Regions:
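A short, N-terminal "cap"/entry segment at the start of jelly-roll beta-barrel domains
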Residues: 1-31, 42, 110-131
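Short, charged/polar surface micro-motifs in flexible loops or helix N-caps
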Residues: 27, 36-39, 58-60, 67, ...
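Short, conserved beta-strand element in jelly-roll/cupin
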Residues: 34-36, 45-61
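Structural motif
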Residues: 51, 58-60, 67, 83, ...
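Short acidic-glycine-tyrosine-enriched beta hairpin
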Residues: 65-80
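Ligand-binding loop in jelly-roll beta-barrel domains
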Residues: 80-107
Length: 131
């Protein structure tokens, strides 16, 4: 369910999208995500910067050519055009994402370099001590 309430000083949006974004906002989209072991995710990129603020779980994420161990309290910062992915999860990974402003002519949402990336993949479970 998406709900938006706008007045002069405050906007409350449960899930932010380009259609619901207040005109003064630099955020293209935002929301909550949850990825479980054996869940699905996709390697993708955006025409804007994206940020994940993680509040639960542990796992491995890739940003560009590097892989990082992440957990609650970490912020994953992905520059425009850089592929990123949730590779594996030890404990259900939960976080808040937001995308910066998409430039004029930019595309919205997940973008893919290959058809295989667009299909997504199973997020491998990690054993204790692997992440």
């Amino acid at each position: 369910m998406t709900d938006t309430r706008i007045d002069d000083d405050l906007t409350v949006v449960q899930t932010l999208s380009p259609e619901l974004r207040p005109s003064w906002s630099d955020v293209t989209s935002a929301g909550i995500f949850r990825v479980e072991p054996n869940g699905r995710f996709d390697k993708h990129y955006h025409d804007c910067d994206e940020y994940w603020l993680l509040f639960a779980g542990r796992g491995l994420v890739s940003v560009g050519e590097r892989t990082y161990t992440v957990g609650a309290g970490d912020i994953v910062c992905t520059p425009t055009g850089t592929e990123h992915d949730i590779v594996a999860v030890a404990e259900t990974l939960e976080g808040f994402w937001f995308e910066g402003r998409t430039p004029p002519g930019g595309r919205f949402g997940h973008l893919y370099r290959t058809a295989e990336d667009a299909e997504g993949h199973v997020v491998e479970p990690l054993e204790e001590g692997e992440a």
